[in-house]
Design a protein with these regions (language model features):
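N-terminal hydrophobic/helix-forming segments and targeting peptides
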Residues: 1-113
């Protein structure tokens, strides 16, 4: 069970979900919850809601679906990307880190800082 939780968390963390662009995370979670036989719904703000059946005390769990990341602001003629940070990403931790550039419509391009 411990290994399964680790695998599920790793898979979830690899789903791109920058602040304001959390749809892929919500879709991933919705699919996983529906596979467990649970119904889901979304509100007008994009929050994913699920109710677990039971008779015990009601508990609400909420968390962010978004991640720190970057937005591409310019693509230079040589293909170099100029990016702007979203959130508190520390610059000193970036060199050599793998990145995933989400082009749109599920088309992603792997790269390195």
């Amino acid at each position: 069970m411990k290994n399964r939780i680790k695998q599920d968390l790793q898979a979830l963390m690899l789903v791109p979900g920058l602040s304001g662009y959390e749809e892929r995370v919500a879709g991933y979670l919705k699919k996983q919850l529906q596979a467990l036989g649970l119904s889901t719904r979304s509100d007008r703000l994009g929050n994913l809601l699920v109710q677990f059946p039971g008779t015990g005390p009601k508990v609400m769990l909420f968390t962010h679906m978004d991640q720190l990341g970057f937005v591409v602001r310019k693509i230079e003629d040589d293909g170099f990307l100029r990016v702007e940070r979203l959130g508190g990403v520390p610059e000193r931790a970036l060199a050599g880190q793998p990145v995933l550039v989400c082009v749109g419509e599920g088309r992603d391009v792997a790269g390195v800082f």
